[in-house]
Amino acid sequence: MATPHINAEMGDFADVVLMPGDPLRAKHIAETFLENVREVNNVRGMLGFTGTYKGRKISVMGHGMGIPSCSIYTKELITDFGVKKIIRVGSCGAVRMDVKLRDVVIGMGACTDSKVNRIRFKDHDFAAIADFDMVRNAVDAAKALGVDARVGNLFSADLFYSPDGEMFDVMEKYGVLGVEMEAAGIYGVAAEFGAKALTICTVSDHIRTHEQTTAAERQTTFNDMIKIALESVLLGDKE
């Protein structure tokens, strides 16, 4: 039944949901990649859709910006609508010089300055990691599509406008591939409620070089990432 944030019914969502931050990007994904699309959520403008990809039922819905927002939506999808797998498809900023604009990053794990997982885990560090099979399927899908995806750690930041520039040096030293704002929270929610999750990001800007894509480009040109996510779902069905 409907929740305070999702006005859908059980069965409206597929067992796999792709989740960009921007609800308009969710609309673009649904209209571009799915067939037989119908809207299943519009509360607070957080658009959600269900359709089919090569005959496979798949949903896509926005999750908003930051860990608090995405945690609400992912929790409700899992506990109230029976969702089993969540794939965040978003953008990230690069800190390493060998990571380029529009590179695809598969988030094997997620560091964070947020305390949400410590709250969950009795103030201990929680290893926020993606589901192994989902990572493997995404890697295999990228190879099949001829996309040279990077695999490694993301950093989920609470502040978009961070005052601590030195932290980027630390991230680079530790091999962090990209900075975003949600993966660690989504991995924590999935672990808490027995679901599986993965984050795939496209590099939208470079923190060192100050290169960046436009908002319109973020909405329409990150197709490689979406294709990887969708094809990885089909690979997962074969397991």
UniProtKB/Swiss-Prot annotation:
The annotated site for Important for catalytic activity falls at: 218
Q: Which Pfam families does this entry report, sorted A to Z?
A: PNP_UDP_1 (PF01048)
Instruction: Cite the GO molecular-function annotations of the record.
Output: guanosine phosphorylase activity; purine-nucleoside phosphorylase activity
Is Hydrolase among the key words of this record?
A: no
UniProt entry keywords in alphabetical sequence? Glycosyltransferase, Transferase
Q: Cellular component terms, GO, for this chain's entry?
A: cytosol
Q: Which residues bind phosphate?
A: 21, 25, 44, 88-91
Q: Assembly state and interactors?
A: Homohexamer; trimer of homodimers.
Function, as annotated, reads: Catalyzes the reversible phosphorolytic breakdown of the N-glycosidic bond in the beta-(deoxy)ribonucleoside molecules, with the formation of the corresponding free purine bases and pentose-1-phosphate. Acts on 6-amino and 6-oxopurines including deoxyinosine, deoxyguanosine, deoxyadenosine, adenosine, guanosine, and inosine.
What's the protein here called?
Answer: Purine nucleoside phosphorylase DeoD-type
**Organism of derivation:** Salmonella typhimurium (strain LT2 / SGSC1412 / ATCC 700720)
The gene from which this protein is expressed is deoD
